């Protein structure tokens, strides 16, 4: 994750402040040309003493096939993917496609990448199993294909190279246990998920239900989750409908959680902010600090886990290693903005382990005044890279 200084720790290789200080013209001279051509090379990794093992030696092309790319989380994730791929001098090109939330376009994008002979393709398959035939075809055409985060079914080694994911159920469970404690085991909650049927939201819902067992927590709204497509405007519409239907909403969970606050849905309806469990965003800590400064007894509380913009790093590693003859035999270690280090994957892992960012009940919060509300506070990017990514265009 992003450090307050320009110090980053990527996949177990610590880049020192002295090395970063030299990240000028001479460093860029050793940077892949394709990376220098993306927003003047701002996302390019600093030089390392040893080429990471996952890079291999074969010259390859790399692509990220996104099912939907038009939100801040995806832009920060893309920036992290560019940064990770740029660590390998043998990567010759980078392509990013945006399915725009349209399954057929996502399929066409992937088919096009395979037809062009892209060697390593990371896929965020928002449409889930509907993407499997195209993923299988790309794999059979010779590309190393790594779907990540959203499950597509199929078999590793037969339909795609590997699947890289995270333990979404545990995220839901941790959010739920926190909410049970914060509400003293009683209250009305709703869960805002992603697209219909997405494995991420389904698994988080399982974790939430497990955490609520034996309590008086009541699940309101659509189950297993309110469909929002991870679209802030859709989230605002869903929240307005929930507010109109339910006179009491004590807690809300959300995958893309920042819009719960930034939409202004609750203040506009003259309703108190609910307690929130979700993925980290700068708006949470900064809002909490502001409200506490105004009134130390303000009831607003929240918890977040890392939004895992860094999850793509492991997917990139596996895709490149598979295409270029490398090995994923080093840990993936993330440093947060307070300088705390988190080992999110051990050598050979394909599933990352998340960690808690904020817990306002413990007065442990992240608020970076340099960043806008929508920015993640655990992205694995520098502040400058995060700001650049939020301008879009990746």
What is each residue range found by the language model?
Residues 2-3, 28-394:
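A residue-level marker of the well-folded mature domains of exported/periplasmic proteins
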Residues 2-13:
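Bacterial N-terminal signal peptides that target proteins for export
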Residues 18-27, 281:
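C-terminal segment of classical bacterial N-terminal signal peptides
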Residues 14-15, 259:
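Long alpha-helical scaffolds
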Residues 12-13, 22-26, 390-393:
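Low-complexity, intrinsically disordered/propeptide-like segments
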């Amino acid at each position: 994750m992003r450090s307050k200084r320009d110090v980053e720790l990527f996949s177990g290789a610590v880049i020192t402040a002295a090395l970063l200080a030299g990240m000028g013209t001479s460093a860029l001279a050793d940077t892949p040309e394709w990376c220098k051509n993306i927003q003047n090379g701002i996302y390019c990794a600093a030089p390392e003493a040893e080429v990471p093992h996952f890079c291999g030696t074969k010259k390859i092309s790399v692509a990220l096939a996104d099912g939907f790319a038009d939100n801040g989380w995806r832009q920060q994730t893309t920036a992290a993917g560019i940064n990770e791929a740029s660590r390998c001098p043998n990567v010759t090109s980078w392509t990013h496609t945006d399915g725009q939330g349209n399954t057929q376009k996502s399929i066409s994008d992937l088919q096009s990448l395979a037809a062009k002979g892209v060697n390593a393709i990371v896929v965020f398959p928002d449409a889930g199993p509907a993407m499997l035939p195209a993923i299988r075809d790309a794999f059979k055409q010779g590309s190393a294909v790594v779907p990540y985060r959203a499950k597509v079914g199929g078999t590793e080694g037969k339909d795609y190279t590997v699947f890289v994911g995270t333990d979404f159920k545990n995220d839901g469970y941790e959010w739920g246990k926190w909410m049970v404690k914060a509400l003293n085991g009683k209250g009305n909650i709703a869960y805002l998920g992603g697209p219909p049927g997405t494995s991420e939201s389904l698994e988080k819902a399982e974790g939430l239900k497990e955490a609520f067992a034996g309590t008086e927590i009541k699940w309101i709204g659509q189950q297993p989750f309110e469909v929002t497509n991870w679209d802030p405007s859709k989230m605002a519409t869903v929240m307005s409908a929930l507010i109109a239907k339910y006179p009491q909403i004590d807690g809300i969970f959300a995958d893309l959680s920042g819009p719960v606050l930034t939409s202004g849905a609750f203040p506009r309806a003259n309703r108190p902010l609910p307690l929130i469990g979700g993925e980290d965003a700068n708006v949470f800590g900064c809002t909490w600090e502001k409200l506490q400064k105004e009134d130390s007894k303000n009831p607003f509380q929240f918890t977040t886990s890392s939004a895992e913009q860094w999850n793509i790093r492991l997917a990139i590693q596996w895709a490149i290693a598979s295409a270029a003859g490398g090995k994923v035999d080093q840990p993936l270690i993330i440093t947060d903005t307070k300088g705390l280090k988190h080992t999110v994957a051990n050598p050979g892992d394909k599933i990352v382990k998340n960690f808690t960012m904020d817990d306002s009940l413990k007065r442990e919060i992240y608020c970076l005044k340099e960043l806008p509300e929508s920015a993640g506070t655990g992205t694995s990017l520098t502040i400058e890279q995060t700001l650049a990514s939020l301008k879009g265009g990746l």
